[in-house]
Every structure is written in C-alpha cells, then in structure tokens.
C-alpha cells in the first residue's frame, strides 16, 4: 500500500504537471521538420540566461516555506504572504536586468529582434511567484489536483501556441518564445484566486525591511546553491555563446540536452512525491527507512536511464524527423546518465534543509557547477561543443564524492547512508551501465 501511495503521488506531482512536456515530445515529429539548429541555438541561449535569472529570483526565500509549514502550524500563511510579495518585487527588478543582458547578447540577431526576444522571454521571470508558492504548498498538503490541473492547463495553452506558431506559421524559435510567455501568464492568472482566496496566502507588504534582511542572512547561501544547479545545466551554453560558438552548434547541443533531460521527470516525480516521507523519516530519526527510500529512488532512476539511453537512437529516428539532429542522440544518451545521481543530491541536500545549514548546501551543487565552468572554459576552444557533453557528465557526478572530503556531509551522510562505500558501489554501477549503450557512439 505504501508503494502504491508513492506511485500515485509520483504520478500526481511529477508526471501530470509534465504531461504537457510529454505531449510536446509526441508533437516533435510534426514540428522538427520546420526547425533548424539555428532555432534551437537561439532557444538554448535564451533558456540558459532566463534559467539563470529565474533561479536567482526567489532569493533563497523558499527555504522558509517548507520549514515554516511544519514549524508554525498556525501562522505559516503570514510568512508565506510576505515571501510571495518579495517574489513579485524580485521578479520586476530582475526582469529589467535580464532585458539589458539579452540586449547585449545574440550578436547574430538584429537589435530590433533582440529587444522583442528580451521582452517576450522575460515574462516567466516576471510572473514566477505564484507558481513557486504552489509548487511548495500542494506537495506539503499531499493534494496534487490544484497544482496539477492549473499547471497542466497553462502548459497545454503554451504548447498549443508553440505548435500553431511553428507548424502553421513557420515561426521557428519565436514559437518557443510565444509558448513560454503564454504558459507563464495563464499559470499566474489561474493560481491567483486559488492562493489568495481559498488558501488565504495574500501578498503582505512588509515595510520593516529588517525582517527581509534577517531572512536574507539565512537564505542567501541558497542563491549560489540554486545558481550552482543552473551552472550545471546552463553554463555550458552561456560559455559557448561568450566564445562565439555558432548558434547552429549550440542548437545541436541544446537539442540533445533537451531530449536527455526528459529523464528528470522520473527523478523529480519520485522525490516530490516523497517529500512528506523524507521530512518525517529523517525528523523521527528513522534513518534506515530514509536509506530505503533513497535506494528505491536511485535504482528506479538508474533502470529508467539505462533503458532510455539504449533506445535513444531509435527514439530520435521516430521523434526527431530532421536529419540535422540525428547525431544528437549520443548527446542525449550521455545527458541521461549525467542525471542518474540526482536522487543522491536530493536526499543529501534534504538533510541540510531540515537542519537549516544552508551554507553547507554550497558544496553540493556550487562546486560541481564550478567544475563544469572550468572544464567548459578549458575544453571548448580545443574540442568545440562536443566537449561540453563530457564536462556536463563529469561535473554532475562529482556530487557523489563530496561526502568523502567535506566534513559536514561526511558526518551527516554516514548517519543515514551508513557505510560511505555504498556510494562507490552505486557510482560503479552507473559507470558499468553507461559503457553499454553509449560506448560505440562515444568513440565515434
């Protein structure tokens, strides 16, 4: 019954909100004939910069959402109201900065188009607040429907706009831009009455800036922590853009990364569904149960990754109806394996969140992000965009070695993992599995 409950919640919180993405995957055979590596290059650069700003925008204040829900059962809505107001203010200020950054990039695009690209693509940054609040609230309440239905409707609206723009109007990358803007507007609008009226989370303007300063003192380490995750996923394309790698090459990498990253739906759905269990088992010091949940997530992810990686060339032949992108299947397979250790990150970081040791989170993700940047800077001028695939894999997997040399994680990981050599076993299993489906294509 417990396993069935987990699977139901995993489907509700993880798969259902991503259903539009899965439908979009099915639409790729229809739209890829009308897309080029240049279109994916533009889209890859835009998503890298926008992802960077959207990650910074919460200012780490989401740290207080989960903890306050458990610790202040009668007053958590007041704190959440302040946080959502800070989110709105942050979105406005960072949108202005983002527009200026985009105007300085994309030198291959004329300045008039750059301005339109910047204005349209900043909409998700401007309106991120409601969605972030909902993504924290409903997993904690264990009620997926309010989150799922609204997220799904917003995603379907955006996906429909993208499809119509690309398939019927041959709009190329503009179709992606229109789609994400519509998704953000619809989602923001749908969550307003739900959060403000039904849940009683109303924006509270707090003129006592000292409270915000005090909160930021605790939350600021989460900014580089969250930023580190973006450095892992987006820094490569930003560095390629700064090195003036052609948008066509960036587009090939972006296409492979997009396809490989679909595997995170499984990891995300499992972990989000398990959030209440993770909190309860660790807080109750039931560490063997915590470890069992980790094994369940880790081996489910490994099995899914291996299966998808084996079939990736065939998936490309069916889904990507464009010869220009067929070589990207090798990139997609490796990106799948880059994500295989994400359950370890989620379970390890959860401990630091519970203990409110936010500064320690910097090790978990900022260091791998720094490794990715370092390798990209060194290798891109020598090997081109292909080197980015290898640097992404190496940097993602460095998460697994952190408990061996960082005292904080060495101590706390041993509490729930037991012997740390179990991490080595999992790492070796991943290495063995990656060799089979990808070795011939890695050599080529």
Tell where the protein language model's regions lie, with residue ranges.
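Single conserved hydrophobic/aromatic residue that forms the stacking wall/gate
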Residues: 432-444
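Helix-loop junctions and terminal segments of transmembrane helices
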Residues: 28, 57-74, 256, 260-284, ...
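Signature of the first transmembrane helix
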Residues: 5-63, 91, 95, 99, ...
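Interhelical loop/hinge segments that connect adjacent transmembrane helices in multipass membrane
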Residues: 1-6, 145, 169, 173-179, ...
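Alpha-helical transmembrane segments of multi-pass membrane transport and lipid-handling proteins
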Residues: 25, 84-110, 267, 291-342, ...
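Hydrophobic alpha-helical transmembrane segments
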Residues: 148-197, 366-374, 385-406
